[in-house]
Amino acid sequence: MTRELESKYIYAVKELAEEFFVLTCGEHEGPRGVNRIIERSLRSTIMPKNKELYLRGLAACGVEYQDNNGEISFEGVSDKEINFLSKVPNLIRPKFDLIVKKIFPKLDQVDINYHAAKSICDTRFSPTINFNSLFDLVKKDSDKRKLIQISFEKMMNEIILKAESEGLKNSFFLHISPNLGNKNGKETIKLSTQDDIGSTDIQLLIKGAVKDSGVLFLLNKFIADKTGKAPFGRNFNFRNSPNSITGKIDLCKKTIQKDDMPLIIGVGDTVTSKKHNGKEIYLRGGSDRSFLEFIQILGNEFGIKNKIIFVDSSSGEVERPSTKKTGLKGISDIDDNLKFDMVFENGPKEYISWFIELASKRSNFKKKLTI
């Protein structure tokens, strides 16, 4: 709740104008939203709207669209779904107390309340249980971390069953970050080990709200703004998106002219690859993997050299494999189809410096074209 962004980065986004979109499983609005980070960073709640400095793009993994002045829309979501989502934090709270008391029997209620406030995220479209606060209590005890992960995954599945009992059978799914891929429509939790913290949060998301579907939505919007014609239709949203990457590629090939397809730079920090039971079989996942793979394949199909960038966030708030220490181990593998064009080993600060320079050069280049 105290995070800030470098103001130069916010203005660099503004310089890129219609060529920049954010695509995140966080949210724009609310006390924990990115809009509050923008306002804190600029020391103003008025300037971001007046100067159109909010981050344009999709949040809640593809549900919540926002333009630069903070106007928000969320097509494809029913009132019944929103009403249920609003109840989820209150459904989680008593279950949270029971789980924490079982794992930490010596913890008093004051401390439980403290960790509940940090762990239960009452975001509008993506109520979340985050483990980091509880992980701090167990330090390097990977068995305790596993117990936390397994207990809360079970709890979140109970929330899904509650939704189904209220007539919302095909409305929601659990997004686990980071994960080890998708099996039978469910994301596989990445259990903690001694050298990898594993999954750190579980979100209840609206079914269909995945980042690769978000790419389609943003692509449709970009081309519509550029040409006046939306290839997938003006009312396209995540619920209209094909489920598979192949289906998404086929839709693009059928409806988008090659001259209208832009070069896309995809940036992510959550990609995983782990050997399965010590065999030469890898479980590949991470909340950024699918949309980065989609961008890469899309470029290949249209003969465009799309770029894939990986930002190493291992030195941040979450323990993750470090490219500096172990290369791409735990992130990618020799047989991985996803290939990175750039890796920022020094993390977000290095990436932000590069981004600011890129935005300046791109802006100057476009100005020269108009002279």
Question: What is the predicted function of each stretch?
Answer:
Residues 1, 62, 270:
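Anionic group-transfer/hydrolysis microenvironments
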Residues 63-68, 128, 316-319:
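A short acidic, often aromatic-flanked loop/helix-cap motif at beta-alpha or helix-coil junctions
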Residues 68-80, 101-110, 165-170, 217-222, ...:
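Short secondary-structure transition/capping segments
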Residues 3-10, 34-42, 81-104, 141-167, ...:
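Well-ordered, non-membrane alpha-helical segments in soluble/globular domains
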Residues 205-208, 212-371:
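Mg2+-dependent phosphoryl-transfer enzymes with acidic/Ser/Thr/Gly-rich catalytic loops
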Residues 113-264, 269-277:
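Conserved acidic, metal-coordinating active-site core of Asp-based
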Residues 4-124:
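Active-site phosphate-binding/coordination module
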